[in-house]
């Protein structure tokens, strides 16, 4: 009898130890951070935007952690510099998934840096949220990809459509167009839309060329474009090319009715300060500016926080262009995690596909290929710029929204005259 009692006591002791170990394991896991991995352009041609996006993501992390994290666990960002170089991306994401074993992945900044990460996400069956990628999923059709870009379900056309709408509303309507694009993924996708829209609207393309990344001098290109005397000049370019093309256009006195369209980088505060009045007359895309028509709940508080931190880390002091969307991208991810109470990739993807999200850049829902259900591409024009001062660029009156109508704050000034007008 005593032997039996002793046996039960030993079994009970073992059970208590096992339960204790189990509880300790659960507690230890609860203390482990949820890791979100990504590459980001911290050096190279996209670094001005990439570093501002990183600050926005760190603000989101700090905000979430101050409220207890996600699923009761702190959030940790695991990131590497992709150097604005697509060739670095596959290795970065392979390391994040296979070595770092992060819980979730999101993209770095821009189409050229998202596209090479897609095969890694797909082969590992991972949820993947892209930041400012134009039509990245149009070839893959991957059901776990979602795009933080207001280009809607038909992004290739939606991106350039507002430029055409603004130009075609003019009297007389433009008849000819010059198209210049960088030889890279984003400009390629944008150019396809431009060609289609030109054909649909009976506009003759009189110049259609690409240029290699790193082109040092755009003056010969501007001269070749001017020789065709186009009514419209659409440029699809990344920041170094945008800066080079605008410099050549102003120095050469390019004359056309409408110039711009798809020039990435002109939205950066540093570029605005660099060119000042030379931006006058350029018609370009944007995604958000603090116009009265676009002050969504929470965004001004975010910008106040961002702008207070920006000087210390040397990033874009205004933060209008990319930071709100970098923050909103993680808002979507975080809300999905909390709603599903899970890190399961399938459950998260199903939830994001089937639910709307309230973010600082407005209400968002996702449709086919993970694109926004509705496009919201802004067409703006720089007007009345008198100097290169930062304070001047805080006034949205010099950057009126021309389209879409529900956000419109001004009307176009034409023709473009090498930056001398506006």
Language-model regions, residue ranges each:
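Beta-alpha junction/loop-to-helix N-cap segments that form part of ligand/metal-binding clefts
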Residues: 35, 48-55, 68-140, 211-218, ...
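Solvent-exposed, acidic/polar segments of extracytosolic/periplasmic ligand-binding ectodomains
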Residues: 34, 353-422
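Extracytoplasmic "Venus flytrap"
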Residues: 34-58, 80-87, 109-110, 180-189, ...
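Bacterial N-terminal signal peptides
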Residues: 12-23
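Extracellular/periplasmic periplasmic-binding protein-like sensory domains
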Residues: 150-153, 249-327, 338, 393-394, ...
């Amino acid at each position: 009898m005593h032997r039996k009692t002793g046996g039960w006591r030993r079994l009970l002791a073992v059970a208590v130890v096992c339960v204790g170990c189990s509880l300790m394991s659960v507690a230890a896991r609860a203390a482990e951070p949820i890791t979100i991995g990504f590459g980001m352009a911290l050096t190279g041609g996209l670094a001005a935007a990439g570093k501002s996006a990183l600050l926005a993501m760190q603000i989101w992390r700090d905000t979430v952690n101050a409220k207890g994290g996600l699923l009761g666990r702190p959030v940790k960002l695991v990131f590497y510099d992709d150097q604005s170089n697509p060739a670095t991306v596959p290795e970065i994401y392979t390391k994040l998934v296979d070595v770092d074993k992060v819980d979730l992945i999101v993209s770095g900044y821009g189409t050229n840096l998202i596209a090479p990460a897609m095969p890694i996400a797909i082969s590992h069956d991972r949820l993947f949220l892209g930041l400012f990628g134009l039509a990245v999923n149009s070839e893959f059709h991957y059901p776990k990809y979602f795009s933080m870009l207001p280009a809607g379900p038909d992004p290739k056309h939606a991106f350039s459509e507002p430029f055409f709408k603004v130009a075609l509303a003019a009297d007389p309507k433009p008849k000819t167009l010059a198209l210049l694009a960088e030889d890279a993924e984003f400009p390629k996708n944008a150019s396809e839309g431009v060609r289609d829209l030109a054909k649909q609207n009976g506009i003759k393309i009189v110049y259609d060329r690409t240029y290699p990344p790193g082109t040092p001098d755009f003056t010969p290109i501007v001269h070749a474009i001017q020789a065709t005397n186009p009514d419209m000049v659409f440029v699809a370019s990344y920041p170094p090319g945008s800066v080079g093309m605008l410099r050549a256009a102003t120095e050469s006195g390019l004359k056309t009715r409408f110039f711009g369209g798809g020039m990435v980088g002109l939205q950066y505060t540093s570029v605005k300060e660099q060119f000042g009045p030379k931006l006058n007359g350029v018609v370009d895309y944007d995604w958000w500016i603090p116009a009265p028509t676009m002050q969504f709940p929470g965004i001004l508080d975010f910008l106040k926080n961002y702008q207070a931190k920006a000087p210390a880390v040397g990033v874009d002091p205004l933060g209008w262009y990319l930071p709100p969307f970098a923050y909103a991208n993680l808002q979507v991810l975080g809300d999905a995690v909390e709603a599903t109470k899970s890190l399961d990739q399938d459950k998260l993807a199903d939830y994001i596909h089937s639910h709307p999200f309230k973010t600082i850049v407005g209400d968002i829902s996702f449709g086919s290929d993970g694109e926004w259900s509705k496009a919201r591409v802004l067409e703006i024009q720089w007007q009345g710029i008198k100097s290169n001062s930062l304070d001047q660029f805080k006034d949205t009156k010099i950057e009126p929204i021309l389209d879409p109508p529900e956000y419109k704050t001004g009307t176009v000034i034409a023709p473009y005259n090498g930056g001398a007008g506006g």
